[in-house]
C-alpha cells in the first residue's frame, strides 16, 4: 500500500534506530546521516528502501500501533504495548462493545480500545484535565487522520459517567481508581468487566480491597507482565541483556448482580 500525505511513516536505519514521521510535502526529515524530503516518501510503497542525501539506506514502513505508541509525544504516562495487549485480551474487549475509559492520558490506550471495538462499538474516553484530553485527542487524530466515529472524548469525572454510559467494559488508568470501582458497583451492568492499570502497590491494595468490600465483584485477578527479547544468531541463542520489567500492575474483575444475602 502506498503512503500518502498525512500518513504516519516509520523510517528504520542500518542500526535499527526508528524515526516516526507524519508525511508533509513541505517538510524534510533530517538526521545524523543526511536528509530525506518527505516528497521522496509520499507515493512510495511501504517496505521500500530509501536513500538519504549522504547515501545512507533507510527502510520505509507504515508504523504498527506499537511503534506509534512508543514514539508518540507524551503529556501523561503511557500504557506500553506489553500492557496494552493483555488489557485487550483479559478485559475481553470485542467488536461492538461499549467501553468507558479514564483517563485519556497519552491516547495510547484509547487507540487500542478503538481498534478492538471496531466500527460497531464505542469508546467513551473521559479525562479530568483539559490539557491531557487535548493531547490524547491529537494523538488519536494523528493515527487515524481524524477523530473516528467510534471514539467520544469527554471532560469530567468518570464516576459521573458510569450510569449514563452503562458500559460493558470499564478500563481505568487513574491515580485513584477505587472511586470508580464504587460507582461501577452501583451502575455497571452485571456480567461486565473492569480493568485498571496501576503503577504502585498501595494503589493496587486499595483498589482490590474496595472491590471486595462492594460484594459485587468476583474473579479479581492481579497480573504483571515482563517482556524480554531474545537474540538468535546462528548457534548463538540467548536472551538480551536488558528486559522490560515493571511498568504497572493490571487488575481485572467481573461485575455480578447483588448476592441474595445483600438484597433488600
What is each PLM-predicted segment?
Residues 1, 71-84:
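Conserved SAM-binding loop and adjacent beta-strand
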Residues 1-62:
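N-terminal auxiliary segments of SAM/dcSAM-dependent transferases
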Residues 89-94, 116, 144, 162-164, ...:
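Glycine-rich helix-loop-beta junction characteristic of Rossmann-like nucleotide cofactor-binding loops
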Residues 94-105:
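Conserved class I S-adenosyl-L-methionine
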Residues 106-119, 185-186:
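Conserved SAM-binding loop of SAM-dependent methyltransferases across substrates and taxa
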Residues 115-122, 190, 217:
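Conserved S-adenosyl-L-methionine
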Residues 126-177:
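S-adenosyl-L-methionine
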Residues 181-249:
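C-terminal substrate-binding/active-site "lid" region of AdoMet-derived donor-dependent transferases
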Amino acid at each position: 500500500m502506498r503512503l500518502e500525505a498525512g500518513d504516519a511513516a516509520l523510517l528504520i536505519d542500518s542500526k535499527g534506530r526508528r524515526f516516526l514521521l507524519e508525511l508533509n510535502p513541505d517538510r524534510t526529515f533530517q538526521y545524523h546521516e543526511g536528509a530525506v524530503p518527505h516528497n521522496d516518501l509520499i507515493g512510495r510503497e511501504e517496505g521500500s528502501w530509501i536513500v538519504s542525501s549522504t547515501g545512507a539506506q533507510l527502510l520505509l514502513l507504515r508504523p504498527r500501533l506499537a511503534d506509534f505508541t512508543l514514539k508518540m509525544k507524551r503529556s501523561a504516562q503511557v500504557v506500553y504495548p506489553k500492557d496494552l495487549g493483555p488489557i485487550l485480551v483479559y478485559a475481553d474487549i470485542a467488536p461492538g462493545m461499549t467501553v468507558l475509559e479514564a483517563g485519556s492520558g497519552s491516547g495510547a490506550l484509547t487507540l487500542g480500545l478503538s481498534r478492538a471495538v471496531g466500527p460497531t462499538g464505542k469508546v467513551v474516553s473521559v479525562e479530568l484535565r483539559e490539557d491531557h484530553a487535548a493531547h490524547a485527542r491529537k494523538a488519536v487524530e494523528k493515527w487515524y487522520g481524524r477523530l473516528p466515529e467510534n471514539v467520544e472524548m469527554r471532560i469530567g469525572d468518570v464516576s459521573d459517567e458510569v450510569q449514563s454510559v452503562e458500559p460493558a467494559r470499564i478500563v481505568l488508568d487513574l491515580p485513584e481508581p477505587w472511586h470508580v470501582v464504587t460507582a461501577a458497583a452501583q451502575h455497571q451492568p452485571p456480567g461486565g468487566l473492569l480493568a485498571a492499570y496501576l503503577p504502585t502497590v498501595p494503589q493496587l491494595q486499595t483498589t482490590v480491597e474496595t472491590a471486595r468490600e462492594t460484594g459485587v465483584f468476583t474473579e479479581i485477578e492481579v497480573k504483571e507482565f515482563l517482556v524480554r527479547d531474545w537474540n538468535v544468531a546462528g548457534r548463538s541463542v540467548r536472551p538480551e541483556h536488558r528486559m522490560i520489567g515493571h511498568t504497572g500492575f493490571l487488575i481485572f474483575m467481573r461485575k455480578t448482580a447483588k448476592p441474595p444475602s445483600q438484597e433488600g
